[in-house]
């Protein structure tokens, strides 16, 4: 029960009576206690005690429910929030408050329960676990942050999946600016924290049980969480969101479009825990810059009549790009920014809205983005203790790109493992599957001893909603990966040594890449054991002695054998295609049989650079722009060369490599030092092999190249093997759907160019993508780049079929 002033007075009277009758030792101890009771400090503490009781009573009579021991909030309209800095939250020689037990208000370790929304001025006590003296803080800022803060005590029961959250920060690795606090970076779906529902992303942890983690290293905080036991009490500080003002803007597009960049969206958060679409850049001279009202940090709530709340990033991009000349924006402006612009480094995944610039502005439009300190991979450690090793049930809803993960294994009963999670795919968005998971069953089908083919079939035929029983087994997967690496090394060595002999002998194994789609059900007279495949699939041929059918197997993206059977021979493919063309009244160009392509021989190679990317076909410019603006940490552009004189505001090596003599550049072009070059306004412009290599090797980025298909072979000759992706339109209407701003005549010309491009350069393509919309095509392009980034890739072999 709380201490009353009248109780103290009765205690003093009793102590004085005992003092006169007791022995000498008792009298000495009683005098000390009386001195304490009569001191000014003790009287002040009694005053504070009465103040709090009065406040509690007023709040209770006003009908406010008290939740003792659970939430501690401070919302002081008169005084700014505490400064959350270890120097100001120390337990040193600060004013000490005596915490007295109260069964009604302090059930946990004698912590005094303060009522929510208590108005205490001018100072506020920081609540600490028992044994720690609170400090009366009068500072006004939390590491440079404005706005209100709140404190909360959250008790979690560690479950099978641990505590269910990830952390970042610490004195050795600050997460936000120079703040050493331990921040929550992710709430794991289905975990203890998610089920409790109170812990939020960006909360900072002050204490774990009785352990102070306000100014500690990251590893210390990790150990504190691991050693906290089955019941864990977290004392967290949270920065309350600022108020927002909703406003309507009208922008009129100019030569530079709307003139701003955005970031964010579902599955692509700009601010952790927030799916909003944020303005990240205002382009000078653009419509937004001239209007002057839109600012960095504003949220875009709607574009014209389309709301952008809880939408994918691609949907927001499409909404802004598919607008007319007059655009109405509904914008939320934050009245008080919590974070300094440079203090917080979320993923800079943005999309800009400006049309293509003329040749003189080309370098500025596609200049390499400066490296960002933030990685899309959270800097926080996902605690091993929080990753359950027990079997768990996961439900995945199949998306437009399938389930969004690859599998390996299935030989000699070794199990089926997840080897790759596609960024933005169904598995990635669920957050419940990870590399190293073993799949035990799919929709009730036991896969513990399944072959790779059986597992692939079970996943393919599982329907839209797939229930997976999986178990995290990283050690087994690591051993499996090591085995795959050894096999890959043997594969690379054997393919190089025996490639020439393989082609001469019908009994030797070799590798080919398919240059066409093959559907066995559409092939009249097909074998029941035939294997269907798509353009770009790699096949291992075991026996090519038969003139019509080769015994072969299809390889999965990571090199393991996926399916075996028979494929049509080169002779069969070319004969059937020749007959088809003649039936349609078309002859191969100049009567050449090499016009018809079937397979090319390939060998596996290991690369130690980011492969350049060449997009070909309709909408290639839009794809290039979106990749550069959306993922500046992964994609870059190289600096071109020119013989044009340098302008006053330009810098050599940043805007262009300015070549002093036209003769020198012509000589370099003839020496094959350029992958492409041309003339504009009597000046030479070109992209050199060295410029591409600098982006690929030194910056470690995929160099986006706006070049013709001829550049593919030149890059291959320079040992820089690009990812060349052809966007294949299926019809005139498909072109119009992909590029909505084209007229019908422009779309027809684009279709004709695409058909000719495929005829002339199909063997140069790494992959062919198709789709009903630009968004679908863009998603496929990103998937291809992800799969073919390396380090192990298939490259053309010197030997020909």
Swiss-Prot record:
Residues 153-240, 248-335, 393-474 form the PDZ domain. PANTHER family: DISCS LARGE (PTHR23119), DISKS LARGE HOMOLOG 4 (PTHR23119:SF33). Postsynaptic scaffolding protein that plays a critical role in synaptogenesis and synaptic plasticity by providing a platform for the postsynaptic clustering of crucial synaptic proteins. L27 domain is required for targeting to postsynaptic density. This is Disks large homolog 4. Ubiquitinated by MDM2 in response to NMDA receptor activation, leading to proteasome-mediated degradation of DLG4 which is required for AMPA receptor endocytosis. It comes from the Eukaryota. Belongs to the MAGUK family. One of its GO terms (biological process) is receptor localization to synapse. Residues 339-373 are annotated as: Disordered. The gene is dlg4. InterPro entries: DLG1-4_PDZ_assoc, DLG1-like, DLG1_PEST_dom, GK/Ca_channel_bsu, Guanylate_kin-like_dom, Guanylate_kinase_CS, L27_1, L27_dom. PROSITE patterns: GUANYLATE_KINASE_1, GUANYLATE_KINASE_2, L27, PDZ, SH3. It comes from Danio rerio. Pfam families: Guanylate_kin (PF00625), L27_1 (PF09058), MAGUK_N_PEST (PF10608), PDZ (PF00595), PDZ_assoc (PF10600). CDD domains: GMPK, PDZ1_Dlg1-2-4-like, PDZ2_Dlg1-2-4-like, PDZ3_Dlg1-2-4-like. GO terms for molecular function: ionotropic glutamate receptor binding; protein heterodimerization activity; protein kinase binding. Keywords: Cell membrane, Membrane, Repeat, SH3 domain, Synapse, Ubl conjugation. It is a peripheral membrane protein. SUPFAM superfamilies: L27 domain, P-loop containing nucleoside triphosphate hydrolases, PDZ domain-like, SH3-domain. Its main location: membrane.
